[in-house]
């Protein structure tokens, strides 16, 4: 099994060499090199041409009754790192600012143990590309990556949380993370001279009405217990101060703890946009893009076992948490397979996920390996 020092060395290499989603070529090769150092007797690797940077590693069980899968993401973010660390990103404007370097390292640590100590059930470790931007889990699933002996019965995953103490495991039954839907809208009117508004169709006025009206979608259409968020984060329009804009482009995000809530919000957003476009004489282009970012819903059966184990395991610091409005494309896999996702604390409370100063506490790596490894061993006895 990989030592603490080896795990940290691996993590620092991954952190220094981040790659954007669907471009994780060197990451893929590095992972293969590390896996090649493990005992190979019960180990096989599956790749598919449609998602070439993905890796699905299987360890055959000694007396398998099911196949248990662990997922880790691989990709980094288009962020310029500002930590000043000795092992800071070598790649300009690319950074592991969401902890995927930690996730991969924990997965390798777990894999190294079970490669040496054959598990009772079959174990899959899915190194997934493109969590951040291209919903790699859904793409791998849709391409037929999970078939035959590579078809999981249960799926598990973790995500670092800088607001929790290093090594703390946190989860809950039901929804852990929200679903997310990207929104892009264009109002297309007719430009004209600012002095003659009657001869133009002002797209800024139409789009501004949309932005203010859409704030009622959550407050008047979504069950307050379920929660929801509609945020308009980008508004582009106009070419000069004395020209009426003939086009306005809006981008935003929609988030909900339930898929039904997501569908309610998209329905009402579309209705508002169409109504405003009609009232202001605008052509409307509207696009929603959810992909794999469905709510992460922890299955009751597996999560009951997960919580019971973590609460009672020696050396594990565990807590129940409230759901979070962040989105994770494990949501798609959690809707296809039974399973559980959890937080892994990395103790950097001054910096959030996606911060250019994020600096996780590396002591969380070994604690994460031990906690998840112990859980998998216990799960395979049931």
UniProtKB/Swiss-Prot annotation:
Pfam families: M20_dimer (PF07687), Peptidase_M20 (PF01546)
Highest taxon of the lineage: Bacteria
Record EC number: 3.5.1.47
InterPro entries assigned to the protein according to its UniProt record, in alphabetical order: AcetylDAP_deacetylase (IPR023905), Amidohydrolase (IPR017439), Bact_exopeptidase_dim_dom (IPR036264), Peptidase_M20 (IPR002933), Peptidase_M20_dimer (IPR011650)
Residues in coiled coil: none
GO MF term list: N-acetyldiaminopimelate deacetylase activity
Protein's GO biological process: diaminopimelate biosynthetic process; lysine biosynthetic process via diaminopimelate
Enzyme superclass (EC): hydrolase
Function: Catalyzes the conversion of N-acetyl-diaminopimelate to diaminopimelate and acetate.
Similarity annotation: Belongs to the peptidase M20A family. N-acetyldiaminopimelate deacetylase subfamily.
Name of the protein described by the UniProt record: N-acetyldiaminopimelate deacetylase
């Amino acid at each position: 099994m990989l030592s603490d020092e080896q795990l940290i060395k691996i993590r620092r290499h991954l952190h220094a060499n981040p790659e954007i989603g669907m471009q994780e070529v060197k990451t893929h090769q590095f992972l293969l090199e590390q896996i090649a150092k493990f005992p190979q007797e019960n180990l096989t690797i599956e790749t598919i041409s449609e998602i070439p940077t993905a890796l699905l590693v299987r360890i055959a069980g000694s007396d398998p009754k099911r196949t248990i899968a662990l997922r880790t993401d691989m990709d980094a973010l288009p962020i310029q790192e500002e930590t000043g660390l000795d092992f800071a990103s070598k790649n300009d404007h690319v950074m592991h600012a969401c902890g995927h370097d930690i996730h991969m390292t924990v997965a390798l640590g777990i894999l190294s143990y079970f490669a040496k100590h054959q598990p009772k059930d079959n174990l899959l470790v899915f190194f997934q590309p493109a969590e951040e931007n291209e919903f790699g889990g859904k793409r791998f699933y849709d391409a037929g990556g999970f078939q035959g002996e590579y078809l999981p019965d249960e799926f598990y995953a973790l995500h670092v949380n800088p607001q929790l103490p290093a090594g703390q495991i946190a989860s809950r039954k039901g929804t852990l993370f929200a679903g997310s839907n990207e929104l892009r809208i264009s109002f297309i009117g007719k430009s004209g001279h600012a002095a003659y508004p009657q001869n133009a169709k002002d797209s800024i006025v139409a789009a501004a009405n949309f932005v203010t009206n859409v704030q009622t979608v959550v407050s008047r259409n979504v069950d307050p217990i379920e929660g929801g968020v509609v945020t308009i984060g980008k508004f582009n329009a106009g070419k000069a101060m004395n020209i009426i804009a003939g086009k306005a482009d809006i981008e935003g995000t929609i988030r909900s703890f339930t898929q039904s809530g997501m569908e309610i919000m998209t329905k009402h957003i579309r209705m508002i946009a169409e109504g405003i476009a009609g009232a202001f004489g605008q052509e409307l282009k509207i696009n929603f893009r959810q992909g794999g970012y469905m709510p992460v819903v922890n299955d009751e059966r597996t999560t009951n076992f997960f919580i019971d184990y973590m609460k009672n395991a020696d050396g594990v610091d565990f807590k129940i948490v409230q759901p979070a409005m962040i989105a994770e494309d494990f949501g798609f896999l959690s809707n296809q397979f039974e399973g559980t996702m959890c937080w892994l604390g990395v103790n950097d409370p001054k910096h959030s996920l996606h911060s250019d100063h994020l600096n996780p506490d590396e002591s969380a790596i070994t604690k994460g390996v031990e906690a998840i490894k112990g859980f998998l061993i216990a799960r395979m006895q049931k």
